[in-house]
Amino acid sequence: MAEALYYGGRQRQEQPRSTQLVKATTAVVAGGSLLILAGLVLAGTVIGLTTITPLFVIFSPVLVPAVITVALLGLGFLASGGFGVAAITVLTWIYRYVTGKHPPGANQLDTARHKLMGKAREIKDFGQQQTSGAQAS
């Protein structure tokens, strides 16, 4: 039967031996089945590679350029799709900014715009002072 053990001041029930035996048996059966399945997959992979390798060697002058072409086409489509999504995102952000819906980052853009306008005004004033001082002398 189950025995009561005291662990850390608390009572803990230990499982009966039959339950432990069932758990151990289930674990061994499941683990063994998976191990056998892994061995069969490994054997199938080795046999498949052994039979397919000569075909790869014979057809490699055709397969290598074809694989390179397909890879480049796939990367091109992936890049163009990514650029398209980025463009749509940027255009959506600009639309929200122009219509006054205040998209994320609009405060930073406004701050940068005001700083640039202030610096441009300072440079303009400095240039006017320099030209008026040069004309007076």
Curated annotation (Swiss-Prot):
Protein topology in the membrane: Multi-pass membrane protein
Parts of the chain that traverse the membrane: 27-47, 55-75
Chief localization: other
Domain of life from the UniProt record: Eukaryota
GO cellular component terms, A-Z: extracellular region; membrane; monolayer-surrounded lipid storage body
Subcellular location: Lipid droplet; Membrane
Keywords assigned by UniProt, alphabetized: Acetylation, Allergen, Lipid droplet, Membrane, Transmembrane, Transmembrane helix
Keyword Transmembrane recorded: yes
Single biological process term from Gene Ontology: lipid storage
Modified residues (N-acetylalanine): A2
Tissue-by-tissue expression: Expressed in seeds (at protein level).
Cysteines paired by S-S bonds: none
Keyword Ligase: no
Family classification: Belongs to the oleosin family.
PANTHER family reported for this sequence: OLEOSIN, OLEOSIN 18.5 KDA
Job of this protein: May have a structural role to stabilize the lipid body during desiccation of the seed by preventing coalescence of the oil. Probably interacts with both lipid and phospholipid moieties of lipid bodies. May also provide recognition signals for specific lipase anchorage in lipolysis during seedling growth.
Name recorded for this polypeptide: Oleosin Ara h 11.0101
